[in-house]
Amino acid sequence: MKLLGVDTGGTFTDFVWFDGQRLGIHKVLSTPQAPERAILQGIRELGLQGVRFYLVHGSTVATNAVLEGKGVRTVYITNYGFGDVLTIGRQARRELYNLQPQPEAPPVAAELCLETGGRLAADGSVVEPLSERELEALSARLRELAPQAVAINLLFSFIDDRFERQIERHLPDTLFISRSSDILPAQGEYERGIACWLNAWVGPRVQGYVQRLERLVQPAPVHVMQSSAFTIRADQAAKRAVNLLLSGPAGGLMGARRIGDEVGRPHLLTFDMGGTSTDVALIDGQVKLTSEGSIGPYPVAVPMVDMHTIGA
């Protein structure tokens, strides 16, 4: 079976195919409004229609949705008294010493932040239970707000996620639901909340794209490159958009490391310049990961390759 790698950039969509003996490359112009169209065009030009192949894809759909602010209407659910956590953020700010800083828009509008019970203490004990009345109140507000996605981030849910799961079970199946205990089961309600909200905010965009791509290339199995440089099945990627924010650049780093291994150069400085951005990273035998990355104004605590990006 042929292996086909596809990286969608802002300007070009690049293809690399390998049949076990030969390696080939191809390039077409990207189609930003519908990235899957450029992929299908490249497959046709390579003569791979009807040929059995395995597709590994590096995508910028999640990245662009975040940077361009094109997420969907998303409700954020948290515990009583913590609805402003994502707005307050951490002390680290762009203009920390500016006495009159320009205020930034909050990630989530106040009317889309819902507070409820189901609060745990740091040891996992229940501080405040989650009642049926509160669940019904959440459902009523969601019907009024009519979101496409919901992010659920309760205190200390990484210890025990029973209340997050209880809320999820009470929500309509038509909503894209993101639980912080699933997306980033780690300490720190701000970082966990941002990751959970980002996943819900751009998740439907990524899900729709991945499903369209799978239909276009079927029966070829599709895997998507994650920000951590590990691949994930397309159906799983559709649920974990926040793990795809550096999908394309991560694949480039893995390719650079492989070339370094082949020529006996384990220590590399990589420079990946595309039509939209330029990515720079260090490889010291292995691709380095960080949980202190960022995308646009948002900190992203999910594992991702450690690189620096500037405009091209």
What does each of the following model-derived ranges do?
Residues 1-312:
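N-terminally biased helix-coil "hinge/interface" segments that flank
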